[in-house]
């Protein structure tokens, strides 16, 4: 029953203001804080009752089928309880020095490793508006990047201002330089802009793309969205 609505760009900038701000000790605390604060702020602005509800990034809506991505391990879920919350995340400009290579003598990793993270966030180089996304990384080789260093590296894009394609290309190039893999595929699925998907993919071969994300290159296949999209 509001006579007004919130202008879209201002709403994006408003929710961006929660970035880099400690809202609680646990994910549940953070979501409740944002729910309560945003509900209060927007209700006051529009002079009506508005309810805001945040959901975990990895939730899949009923009926959604994220094609070929159930084989990926989500980085945020890989660590032991408490390990992620105690991790020092202090670099917010892209830094390849964060990446650490490990030789997997213990056999923890398979020859082909697939990582997913919903923590990718950068900013538009023209408007500075926030761009949130999911990154999917698949590579085959004898060297591996440590999960902790990869997560820190993904987070390091948060203050960068680049187009989606540049972010994807940078991640691909950095990993290719340090791992020298036989196959590498990096896919960045971003929150839609004006209803338009901008989902760059960079890979060592068309074969790698066909394996990891066939729905993105087949014009006869409907691309399945992520929860963010």
Features from the language model and the residues they span:
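N-terminal intrinsically disordered, cationic/polar leader segments
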Residues: 1-229
């Amino acid at each position: 029953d509001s006579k007004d609505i919130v202008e879209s760009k201002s709403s994006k900038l408003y929710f961006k203001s929660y970035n880099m701000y400690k809202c609680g000790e646990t994910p549940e605390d953070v979501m409740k804080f944002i729910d309560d604060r945003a509900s209060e702020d927007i209700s006051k602005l529009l002079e009506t009752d508005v309810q805001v509800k945040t959901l975990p990034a990895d939730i899949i809506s009923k009926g959604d089928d994220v094609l070929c991505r159930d084989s990926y391990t989500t980085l945020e879920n890989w660590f032991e309880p408490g390990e992620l919350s105690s991790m020092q995340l202090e670099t917010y400009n892209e830094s390849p020095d964060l990446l650490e290579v490990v030789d997997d003598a213990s056999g923890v990793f398979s020859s082909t490793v697939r990582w997913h993270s919903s923590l990718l966030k950068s900013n538009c180089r023209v408007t500075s508006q926030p761009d949130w996304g999911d990154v999917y990384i698949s590579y085959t080789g004898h060297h591996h990047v440590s999960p902790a260093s990869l997560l820190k590296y993904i987070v390091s894009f948060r203050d960068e201002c680049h187009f989606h394609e540049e972010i994807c290309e940078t991640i691909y190039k950095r990993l290719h330089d340090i791992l020298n893999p036989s196959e590498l595929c990096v896919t960045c699925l971003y929150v839609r802009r004006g209803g338009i998907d901008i989902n760059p993919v960079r890979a060592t071969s068309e074969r790698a793309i066909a394996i990891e994300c066939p729905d993105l290159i087949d014009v006869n296949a409907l691309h399945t969205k992520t929860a963010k999209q």
